[in-house]
């Protein structure tokens, strides 16, 4: 199982939100690349990077910071937020981003996602509120069940699904293991858990399923409730 530390970018700074609300943003660093460098030094191989401004604007908004992170680390980067067309995908691939996360567009235009997955390294972000898919930076809820959307991308060439329980995101209330497993089973695709991770027990629970491919760690690191180096050791030895 892979642990992916997270950096959310807002106005060029590293922040965390609670339940996806922009007004809840708490700034953790004015220099996100330094945070990424620290993750690398702690033993991380991947970075989960989100352009929050981009998610709401529908186009890249933190390019300079993304370039800085790419230039200063050798981490593999998966990036989401405002990626709605092939031009943006190509721009990020040219920057050296390893994997791109398509979210809202996966609900509106799954055929586009499948076409992109045939050409580029694509992950689908499935964000859910009470089991139903949330779109537009979590500002709206759709009538589609998260498991149905996951099933849509089975055998599509999509590399991974990142599933977020929006109600838990940034709350440190514990990860939703059952939801993550349901997405993995519905899709047959490597599934990465996101939202609510608090401490090492969450990592152990996910690892024990044997079906979860990865977990994103955000606020638990920034608030000190999870020892990231301990978590890396656990998954490497497990």
UniProtKB/Swiss-Prot annotation:
Pathway: Amino-acid biosynthesis; L-histidine biosynthesis; L-histidine from 5-phospho-alpha-D-ribose 1-diphosphate: step 4/9. Pfam families: His_biosynth. GO terms for cellular component: cytoplasm. It is an enzyme of class 5 (isomerase). The active site is at residues 8, 127. Keywords: Amino-acid biosynthesis, Cytoplasm, Histidine biosynthesis, Isomerase. One of its GO terms (biological process) is L-histidine biosynthetic process. InterPro entries: Aldolase_TIM, His_biosynth, HisA_bact_arch, Isoase_HisA-like, Isoase_HisA-like_bact, RibuloseP-bd_barrel. Transmembrane segments: none annotated. It comes from the Bacteria. It catalyses: 1-(5-phospho-beta-D-ribosyl)-5-[(5-phospho-beta-D-ribosylamino)methylideneamino]imidazole-4-carboxamide = 5-[(5-phospho-1-deoxy-D-ribulos-1-ylimino)methylamino]-1-(5-phospho-beta-D-ribosyl)imidazole-4-carboxamide. It is found in: Cytoplasm. Gene3D superfamilies: Aldolase class I. Belongs to the HisA/HisF family. This is 1-(5-phosphoribosyl)-5-[(5-phosphoribosylamino)methylideneamino] imidazole-4-carboxamide isomerase. It comes from Nitratiruptor sp. (strain SB155-2). The gene is hisA.
């Amino acid at each position: 199982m892979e642990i992916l530390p997270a950096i959310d970018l807002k106005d060029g700074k590293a922040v965390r939100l609670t339940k996806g609300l922009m007004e809840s943003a708490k700034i953790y660093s004015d220099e996100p690349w330094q945070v990424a460098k620290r993750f690398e030094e702690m033993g991380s191989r991947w970075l989960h990077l989100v352009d929050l401004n981009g998610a709401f604007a529908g186009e890249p908004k933190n390019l300079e910071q993304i370039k800085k992170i790419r230039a200063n680390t050798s981490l593999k980067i998966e990036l989401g937020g405002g990626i709605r067309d092939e031009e943006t995908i190509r721009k990020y691939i040219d920057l050296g981003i390893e994997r791109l996360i398509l979210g809202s567009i996966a609900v509106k235009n799954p055929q586009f996602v499948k076409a992109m997955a045939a050409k580029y390294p694509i992950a689908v972000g499935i964000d859910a509120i009470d089991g139903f898919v949330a779109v537009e930076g979590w500002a709206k809820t759709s009538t589609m069940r998260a498991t149905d959307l996951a099933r849509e991308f089975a055998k599509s060439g999509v590399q991974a699904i990142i599933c977020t329980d929006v109600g838990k995101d940034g709350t440190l209330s514990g990860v939703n293991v059952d939801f993550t497993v349901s997405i993995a089973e519905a899709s047959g695709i490597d599934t990465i858990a996101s939202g609510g991770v608090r401490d090492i027990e969450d990592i152990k629970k996910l690892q024990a399923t044997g079906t979860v491919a990865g977990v994103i760690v955000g606020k638990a690191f920034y608030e000190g409730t999870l020892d990231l180096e301990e978590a890396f050791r656990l998954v490497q030895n497990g």
